[in-house]
Amino acid sequence: VITISGQHGSGRKELGEMIASSLGVPFYGDNLAAMIAEEGKVDLSLVEAMDQVEPDTEEASVLHVAQNRTSLTKTIYQAQESVIRRLAGEGPCVILERCSETILPDAVNIFVYGDLEYRIGRIMKVHPELSRYSLKSHVLSVDNRRKSYCEAYAPGKWGRMETYDICLNAGLVGLDGCLKVTLEYIRGVR
């Protein structure tokens, strides 16, 4: 099982898809949200919204599940953890984000990063209508939200090299280079 995390705009999703395709295993990325919603018995829009907000805490939660007063964030995280563990138990796969590196510490955990200009350039290729100036604050904001969410469940671990087996600078070697390094690493640890 391989987990992929990384900075916004680094190419982590594309790399995950490339790895899964090369290995002939399932890739779980955008489709995870629907599985988590079903597992947690919550609306899909709430799961997707959790990617856009800071995590709430038991004490300061605005949204609570009425019956047991568990915060919505915790309910969704527990469903997320259950889905990720189940998918990993079903066999080899590649799982994108959603604290999977914390949930599956024994997987091959990969972090993809790149300098800010590289990441902005990648996003502008997909969204040329966006300005470079607005993208800079957007990219940093997404990274901060992602870090806050993950650190609510694994303090101090998101983005730290000690958390991952491989940290790849996609801005230096490109996604093809990242794929080559990853496949070589996987061959070495089998």
Report each predicted region and the residues it spans:
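Short beta-strand-centered segment that lines the nucleotide-binding/catalytic pocket of NTP-utilizing
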Residues: 25-38
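Small-molecule kinase domains that catalyze NTP-dependent phosphoryl transfer to phosphate-bearing small molecules
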Residues: 55-57, 131-176
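Divalent-cation
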Residues: 97
